[in-house]
Amino acid sequence: MVQLSKRLKALREQVDRQTIYAPQKALELLKQTANAKFDETAETHIRLGINPKYADQQVRSTVVLPRGTGKAIRIAVLAKGEKVREAEKAGADIAGSEELIERIQGGFMEFDLMIATPDIMPQVARLGKLLGPRGLMPSPKGGTVTMDLVGAIREFKAGKLEFRADRTGIVHIPFGKVSFTPEALMDNLKSVQDAIDRAKPSGAKGRYWRTFHIKSTMGPSIEIDINALRDLKLEGAA
C-alpha cells in the first residue's frame, strides 16, 4: 500500500473528494494546495464518454491558451530546401531535413514539439516508433503537418497545444502555471473546455463529459462542476 507523505496528506485534507467544486473555488484550492519549491504546472485531467479504439470516437485536436503556457517550448521542424531556412527565421529551435531525421534516429530528442511539411512526411514515417509513444509524431489534425511554418511556429510558441485522448478516454492538458493570476488560469481553463467541446467526435454516444479534474504538479486532484464551467461567460468573450 502506498504511504502518503505528511505534506500530501495535509494538502488532501483541504480538498473534499466528495465535492464537485465551482470553477472559481476549484482554482482557489488549486493555488492553495500548490506549495512545492518550484512553479508547479496547472493540469487538467478530463474523462470523456468515448471509446478511442473506434476511429469515430477518437479525440485529437489543439487548443490555444490565451494567457500562454508559462513554459518555453522547443520546436523542431522537418522540411525541405527553403522551408528549412524559413522555419529557422520564424523561431524554430532546430530545423532540418534528412540529416535531422538521422539525428533523431540516433537518439536526439531535445525538443517538445515536431512540425513537418507534407512533402517530407513519407520520410518522417520512419520515426513513428520513436515519436509516436512520446506524442511527438506530426499530424494534420494537430496542426503540426503544414506548409505554413511561420504561422504554426508562432501559434505554438504563443500557447497553442496539441491534445489527444489516451486509451482510456482521458485527456490531459496543462493550462498554465500556479503563479498565474486566477483570471489568467480561468481564461485558459475556459479555452480548454471550449476546445474539448469542439473536438467531440461523431461517434460519441451518451454523456460526453464524465469528470473534469484539475491539480497542480504535486497537489491533490480537485473535481470541477463541468456544467458551471460551460455556462461561465468571461468578460471580453464573444
From Swiss-Prot:
Keywords in alphabetical order: Repressor, Ribonucleoprotein, Ribosomal protein, RNA-binding, rRNA-binding, Translation regulation, tRNA-binding
Cross-referenced PROSITE patterns: RIBOSOMAL_L1
Stored Pfam families: Ribosomal_L1
One of the protein's GO biological processes: regulation of translation
Molecular-function annotations in GO: rRNA binding; structural constituent of ribosome; tRNA binding
Cross-referenced InterPro entries: Ribosom_uL1_bac-type (IPR005878), Ribosomal_uL1 (IPR002143), Ribosomal_uL1-like (IPR023674), Ribosomal_uL1/biogenesis (IPR028364), Ribosomal_uL1_3-a/b-sand (IPR016095), Ribosomal_uL1_CS (IPR023673)
Gene Ontology CC: one annotated term: large ribosomal subunit
Keyword Flavoprotein among record annotations: no
HAMAP family given in the database record: Ribosomal_uL1_B (MF_01318_B)
Known function: Binds directly to 23S rRNA. The L1 stalk is quite mobile in the ribosome, and is involved in E site tRNA release.
Assembly with partners or alone: Part of the 50S ribosomal subunit.
Xref: PANTHER family: 54S RIBOSOMAL PROTEIN L1, MITOCHONDRIAL, LARGE RIBOSOMAL SUBUNIT PROTEIN UL1M
NCBIfam families: rplA_bact (TIGR01169)
Entry protein name: Large ribosomal subunit protein uL1
Lineage: Bacteria, Bacillati, Cyanobacteriota, Cyanophyceae, Gloeobacterales
